[in-house]
Swiss-Prot record:
It comes from the Eukaryota. It comes from Mus musculus. InterPro entries: PTTG1IP. It is a single-pass type I membrane protein. This is PTTG1IP family member 2. The chain crosses the membrane at residues 99-119. The gene is Pttg1ip2. Residues 1-19 form the signal peptide. The keyword Glycoprotein applies. It is found in: Membrane. Keywords: Glycoprotein, Membrane, Signal, Transmembrane, Transmembrane helix.
Length: 150
């Protein structure tokens, strides 16, 4: 697992420097930040009105800023996780799979990737330890099920 340690020595300073640069930019640009804050508030009110005018699911979900609530049959502004609808009746970006289904699909993909990573890590771990056992005098058994007399 030396390659993992080597990559961590390379990537950790890179990530820390990116985080530090981002922090410096955020602290130094206070005027623009307050300007964007008010601009976002005005835009949010506009989006709420715009979403409320849409009356069907396909029209509502075309706009990525809106969600369709199946129970109330109304289009609302997308504000995850704060919504008046139940989680399994929210449709975002499509009218076929609700938001609960999308989140479950994402979790399944993450679990599958984690399992694949675990299998690869175990494979490399076993390869490394087989080489160590062979160097210390233990020879792996190749013909375990071979028939014949000794």
């Amino acid at each position: 697992m030396c390659w993992l340690r080597a990559w961590s020595h390379i990537l950790l300073p890179v990530f820390l420097s990116v985080a530090l640069i981002q922090l410096i930019f955020n602290l130094s640009d206070h005027k623009t930040k307050t300007h964007h804050h008010w601009k976002r508030k005005i835009e949010a009110k506009y989006v709420e009105k715009e979403c409320a005018q849409k009356e069907t699911c396909p029209v509502c979900t075309r706009d990525k800023r809106c969600i369709w609530c199946r129970e109330e049959k109304v289009c609302k502004k997308y504000c995850f996780p704060y919504s008046d609808c139940k989680f399994n009746s929210i449709f975002w970006a499509n009218c076929n799979v609700d938001l609960f289904g999308i989140v479950m699909l994402i979790l399944i993909v993450i679990l599958a990737l984690a399992f694949l990573w675990y299998c690869l890590a175990y494979y490399f771990y076993m390869q490394q330890h087989m080489a160590l056992y062979a160097r210390h005098g233990q020879v792996p058994v190749y013909n375990w099920d071979a028939p014949g007399d000794w």
